[in-house]
Amino acid sequence: EIMIKLFGEGIKDLKYYWFREYELDGIPLIISRTGWSSEFGYEIFLRDGTRGNDLYERIMAAGKEHGLKPGHTSSIRRIEGAMLSYHADADLDTNPFELGLDRLVNLNNEVNFIGKEALKKIKHEGIKRKQVGLELDCEPLKGPNTTFWSIYKGEERIGKVTSAVYSPRLKKNIALAMVKINHSEIGNSLKINIDNKEINSKIIEKPFYDPKKKIASS
């Protein structure tokens, strides 16, 4: 409804993962039918960096009656959908194979690209760690984690929690984590250190909610 108010009924014709050029009160934009929350959404890309404040004010004004508020990278739906946050769940030291994104990498293509040889080596040698989903057995988290939490199997530190939050929808604490590959099996029980307290957890399937992205693609 907010997007229709801003851009008219035609915005509804934009299909999932399609994009189109728009203008809003003279502000040049590109809008795509994608999002970062696993909900039905849009992304608005500003083509004139000097108009950022103008765009923000117009969007917030249009959304006021609908209760629109700013969100951030630790939003519950982002983590429920297992969508990655750069600098948290992924950084310069991670690779697509660790993150379960190898379906997006074609190493057999004749075209060269930066990192191709490095990725070939990683694929040949195998990964040493893997991103997993966790269910944390503790009281509902008061907010998302602001630091990485260490993960242990016995006395061995085997990884870290990168994103964690309490999901009211699922009625449990969920987290994304990077752990050593030999401890990454579904159902594996692990210990997490949160503020010097030992918390039980187990590895579960991810995404935690709507794994087929039916909501986002509807």
Language model segments and positions:
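Conserved, structured C-terminal
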Residues: 1-218
